[in-house]
A protein has these predicted regions:
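Bacterial N-terminal signal peptides that target proteins for export
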Residues: 19-30
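Hydrophobic h-region of N-terminal signal peptides that target proteins for export
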Residues: 32-42
Length: 261
């Protein structure tokens, strides 16, 4: 069967436990305040009109607008309805230009599967099911492990698990980058407990220089300083993901993009 649409719309990862520390609450508050101040005097840019996909590019069989929200689906495979029909991750790409330093807030909800928002990303050769994107991803899912992490699609993989404050350093002799763990910005279990299943959640991404932060429902989920200069993207595209795998539905709305001046 087709995955039930929300409001009637048309590679292996690991995880690790995160333990809280006494300074976590103060660190989270200061980080959130800094992010707000950094973009306080910039102008907000509209990237979604709430009606149609004007300004966006992707596979129109997979992306549409339902009830004021961008809606993406992974349809079932007719030969095996438990499996999705798409064979690679694909994306809806915002065609409004390259974005470097910015703050992006949006709401999402997801039924089954995995999704995310790409930023500072680049478009690769399109696949059978639409655009293919590489770059930073603000990950989220219907499950309990990955919402809020920093993942680099078709790149360096997981750069920070939920709750981590990391510095990414260049690898030796061109090998995978070294990830220095500098403490915690949030408690893994507490962050997950604040995420509403199959309901609307607010996601915020802050990117300034080589420093990126994610927040879900006001709780900071990662803090990363990317010193791997050969691989760290400084600007790029914004895009929304449909993940290969089981049938799923994901929705996005209420985007607020503020670019730093």
């Amino acid at each position: 069967m087709v995955a039930k649409a929300i409001d009637n719309p048309a590679p292996s990862r690991y995880t690790s436990p995160v333990q809280p520390n006494p300074s976590m609450k103060l660190s989270h508050t200061l980080a959130a305040l800094f992010a707000v101040v950094s973009f306080a005097h910039a102008d907000e840019k509209e990237i979604f009109n709430g009606k149609d996909l004007t300004g966006w590019e992707g596979n129109k069989d997979l992306w549409s607008v339902k009830d004021g929200a961008i809606t993406g689906i992974t349809p079932p495979d007719p030969a095996d309805p438990k499996k999705g029909i798409i064979k690679h991750n694909t994306f809806l790409v915002w065609k409004g230009g390259m974005v470097g330093d910015f703050e992006l807030t949006f709401q999402y909800r997801i039924e089954k599967g995995n999704s995310g928002v790409q930023y500072r990303s680049k478009e690769l050769t399109p696949g059978e099911f639409g655009p293919i994107i590489s770059g930073y991803q603000a990950d989220f899912e219907a499950g309990d492990k990955y919402s809020g992490i920093l993942y680099e699609e078709r790149g360096r993989g997981i750069l920070a698990l939920r709750g981590e404050k990391n510095t990414i350093k260049p690898g030796v002799d061109g090998k995978k980058p070294e990830i220095a763990k500098n403490g915690l910005v949030g408690d893994n279990a507490a962050i997950q407990a604040a995420i509403k299943k199959e309901d609307w959640n607010e996601y915020r991404i802050v990117a300034k220089g080589n420093h990126v932060q994610h927040f879900i429902n006001g709780m900071q989920t990662i803090d990363v300083t990317d010193e791997d200069t050969a691989n760290a993207p400084k600007e790029g595209l914004l895009a929304l993901q449909i993940h290969q795998g089981p049938p799923m539905v994901v929705q996005f709305k209420n985007f607020k993009l503020v670019e730093s001046k």
